[in-house]
Regions:
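Short beta-strand-initiation
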Residues: 1, 224-226, 269
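Catalytic cores of enzymes that engage adenine nucleotides and/or redox cofactors via long glycine-rich
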Residues: 219-223, 273
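Short, Gly/Pro- and small/polar-rich lid/capping loops
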Residues: 1-10
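Active/ligand-binding-proximal structured segments within catalytic/core domains
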Residues: 11, 18-69, 143, 180, ...
Length: 420
């Protein structure tokens, strides 16, 4: 499997990976136009725009878009994250030209019919309402806002209802003009694809765009704090976050390994201690997420009102204990989990295309799998313990609580427990 890269004269980047033996391909367009690229008054517009791309173009109706791909048995979708919006499809090899035409059309030529804007506005407001009614969704929005208050990285991707209710055609087209610039666009394809054919299609579709930079991005500033909402629910939910490195820092792999030891799977410390030994919860895990210039190690769990205090304190205690006595066997297991998860995931062309686009956006190149494995293997037990000790010593957290959480300790109490 060979990764090939083409840089168009206007700044659009094309990256492909042919995967021998496959009869299908995944391809799409990734745009550096996510939630953190919005101004306050635009919060939610990147996601709104993603929805509107499927509501029709100059030559296709919304039904035409869906039928074009599904008539050949394919799949088309999109997502908005804090740093990217992606439009992608999975089709059989012979249908790659069709899929590319559809995706480039919805990215470049959204119609923004005012009637369709109103219909989709209602859909998005329902999506926001559904998220608000889902505790283990909304708590992560609150945690993000608490970690990065009063800045784009801390705002929700869906946006607040008042903003979504006010967006019009001019707002959508204005955001396209700001962020859908050639320098922000990556065309990525993997599977049964021919690099030269994808390049030719990309040049034909995007070559007319005038060269333009991507625009500035406000730097992230982790501040932390507490967001507590008391509500009569069956479960008390809590999420605790520590700042970790951004994805350009090699220490991001140390953060991932520590997170895996702490709460990444059934053998992890939190799962074993909180669920298997004490029966305090059904769900508990730790995970990391990284952005260009910051990241978060997040711990989440839900439990009954009577157990929330003990579970939160146990989580902090296990984190401290891990900083003292993580073992080489645990580090080896975490390394194996990370490498196996990465390699097994990349057996899918969709995962490959996603990886190519993500790495191009970070490094403007595609580091080899071997290079990534070497970075994972380079993390020692001492590295992981020192990293964990640094988080414990700093004791700077973001804490979100939702449900019957009156007995849950406050953030200041957790800081004292970490420092003790």
């Amino acid at each position: 499997m060979t990764v090939e890269i083409h840089r168009m004269s206007n700044g659009v980047r094309v990256v492909t990976e042919h995967m021998p033996g496959l009869a299908s391909a995944s391809l799409g367009v990734w745009v550096a136009a996510g939630g953190r690229h919005e101004r306050l008054e635009q919060n939610g517009i990147a996601h709104f725009l993603e929805h509107m791309a499927f509501k029709g173009t100059a030559k296709r109706s919304a039904l035409d878009i869906a039928e074009a791909i599904e008539d050949v048995g394919g799949y088309i979708n999109a997502y908005t994250s804090r740093e990217m919006t992606a439009y992608y499809a999975r089709v059989l090899e012979n249908d790659v030209p069709l899929a590319f035409d559809v995706i480039s059309d919805i990215v470049l030529n959204p119609a923004f019919d005012p009637r369709e804007v109103e219909v989709e506005r209602h859909v998005i407001l329902q999506e926001i309402g559904q998220a608000h009614d889902t505790p283990d969704d909304v708590i992560f929005d609150w945690l993000q806002e608490t970690a990065y208050p009063d800045q784009p990285l801390g705002r929700t991707i869906l946006g607040p209802t008042d903003k979504v209710s006010s967006f019009g055609v001019s707002d959508l087209s204005g955001f396209v003009a700001e962020r859908y610039a050639p320098g922000n666009i990556i065309v990525s394809a993997a599977g049964a694809v021919d690099h030269d054919a994808i390049v030719k299609a990309a040049e034909a579709a995007f070559g007319h765009l005038a060269a333009q930079g991507g625009g500035a991005t406000d730097p992230a500033a982790f501040r932390g704090g507490e967001h507590r909402v008391e509500k009569d629910l069956e479960q008390a939910h809590f999420a605790l976050a520590f700042e970790t490195p951004g994805y350009r820092d090699p220490a991001v792999y140390t953060a991932q390994i520590f997170s895996t030891v702490l709460g990444g799977g059934m053998s992890s410390r939190l799962f074993q201690e909180a669920r298997e030994k004490r029966g305090l919860c059904y769900t508990i895990f730790a995970q990391t997420g990284a952005y260009a210039d910051s990241g978060l190690l997040t711990i989440y769990a839900g439990t009954g009102a009577d157990d929330i205090e003990g579970l939160v304190n146990l989580t902090v205690d296990e984190m401290k204990r891990a900083a003292d006595d993580m073992t080489p066997a645990e580090i080896a297991r975490a390394r194996a989990q990370m490498k196996a998860g990465m390699l097994m995931g990349l057996e899918s062309p969709s995962s490959r295309a996603e990886r190519l686009a993500r790495l191009m956006s970070i490094w403007d190149r595609v580091p080899s799998l071997e290079e990534t494995v070497e970075l994972i293997d380079a993390v020692t037990t001492g590295d992981a313990k020192a990293f964990a000790a640094g988080l414990v010593e700093k004791a700077d957290t973001a804490l979100a609580l939702y449900g019957p959480v009156s007995r849950a300790p406050e953030r200041e109490a957790l800081a004292g427990r970490l420092a003790a």
